[in-house]
């Protein structure tokens, strides 16, 4: 992927403003609520039977932060995202059997949470476009090891 200087700057500046402890839990909770079939991958997280249970589930919140930590690795390694996610892609493909489209869904929800948090003055169309490109590369890398 070729990144322009403006895209790199936009992604890094936006990332620097994101509170992973807020956006991560929000996004993963919303994924589990809006797309309930994704819950099957989180059976070990305890009670996720209702929206309130999901929103109050500490394991969901913690895993949301973990997901955002994975995005941090991508932000820090924008020229090597495929390799950054190679082992994680294998794990999600061969061990957890996650539908790779779920990565796209989560990326869309993360984008909605970020957009709602910062609004149009900070999440401008240019920043949004760079962010979408970044997440598309991440989603592609996560799906790369699927057969």
Curated annotation (Swiss-Prot):
Disulfide bonds: none annotated. This is Hemoglobin subunit beta. Involved in oxygen transport from gills to the various peripheral tissues. It comes from the Eukaryota. Keywords: Heme, Iron, Metal-binding, Oxygen transport, Transport. Belongs to the globin family. The gene is hbb. It comes from Leiostomus xanthurus (Spot). Residues 2-147 form the Globin domain. One of its GO terms (molecular function) is oxygen binding. GO terms for cellular component: blood microparticle; haptoglobin-hemoglobin complex; hemoglobin complex. It holds the Pfam family Globin. Heterotetramer of two alpha chains and two beta chains. PANTHER family: HEMOGLOBIN FAMILY MEMBER, HEMOGLOBIN SUBUNIT BETA-1-RELATED. Transmembrane segments: none annotated. GO terms for biological process: hydrogen peroxide catabolic process. Heme b binds at residues 63, 92. InterPro entries: Globin, Globin-like_sf, Globin/Proto, Hemoglobin_b, Hemoglobin_oxygen_transport. Red blood cells. The keyword Transit peptide does not apply. The keyword Cytoplasm does not apply.
């Amino acid at each position: 992927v070729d990144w322009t200087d403006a895209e790199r700057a936009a992604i890094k500046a936006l990332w620097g403003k994101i509170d992973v402890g807020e956006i991560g839990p929000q996004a993963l909770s919303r994924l589990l609520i809006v797309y309930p079939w994704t819950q099957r991958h989180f059976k070990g997280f305890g009670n996720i039977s209702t929206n309130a249970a999901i929103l109050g589930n500490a394991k969901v919140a913690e895993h949301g932060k973990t997901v955002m930590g994975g995005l941090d690795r991508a932000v820090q390694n924008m020229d090597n995202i495929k390799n950054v996610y190679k082992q994680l892609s294998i794990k999600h493909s061969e061990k957890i059997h996650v539908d790779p489209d779920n990565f796209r869904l989560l990326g869309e929800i993360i984008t909605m949470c970020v957009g709602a948090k910062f609004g149009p003055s900070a999440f401008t169309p240019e920043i949004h476009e760079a962010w979408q490109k970044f997440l598309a590369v991440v989603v592609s890398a996560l799906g790369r090891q699927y057969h």
